[in-house]
Amino acid sequence: MPKKTRRNLLMAAGALLATALFVPVVSSGASAETAAVVTPASAAQPNIVGGNEAKLADYPYAVYLTDLDGNQFCGAVIISRTAVATAAHCALSMPRTKMHVVAGRQDKRSGGGVDTSVSRTWVQPDYTDPGQGDDIAVLTVRGILPYQPAKIAGQSDSELYSPGTKATVLGWGRIADGGARSDYLRSAVVPLVTDRSCTTSYGNYDPKKMVCAGYESGGTDACQGDSGGPLVVGDTLIGIVSWGEGCAKAGKPGVYTRVSAYADDLTREMSARILG
């Protein structure tokens, strides 16, 4: 079964095409409009399965991305008052001018919070597809995000990545593999998995660029629509939802971008500011 990223595929007109088993990975130089529907063997996509509704007051840095019609397709996380981090495959899924960041909105159907456009996009230069790692990007927004940013895990925070550490994944994605998307922010607690175990699950797993989290028996995971969202320990960002095989499958943990490997990049990019 092909692995998949955890982003919802949108047609240029905004119609949803994504299914639980086949979702696109936008490769280098490709757009969401031209990407193939079946993902390459190296990569896979997530919503919170097995979790619960969460209060945005507890996770004010959790945000999501939409197209111009308001269709949510990925998650993201506030890292400064003017920038959010997300997955590279989310940032590349459509032109910057057609992408919005929605913050401070627990229920997607409400009109609260801040809805802002993107003025600048930075994608990790080595990114080619989620299964190869480097699946991280920073979006600089127009205006100010008046919410608490997440802390960024650094190279010295290795203890946060200890196997068994309980982390929280957040998102508005599907609540079952192939099921309905959530209107509300959801959270789930998942333990970090050993690198050895994750390598057994996924032959292309790279412990320098990725981290795995999930239960051996499955049941709790990110899913389609959660890509780009945060994996946190306390209020420290340690991972970005990237890929996996199915959602909440036994022996197939979720794979996240290892934030500490890109801390310097994030620190540099979150201070970039383009007005207008």
Model-derived segments and spans:
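Chymotrypsin/trypsin-fold serine protease catalytic domain
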Residues: 107-111, 115-121, 133-218, 259-264
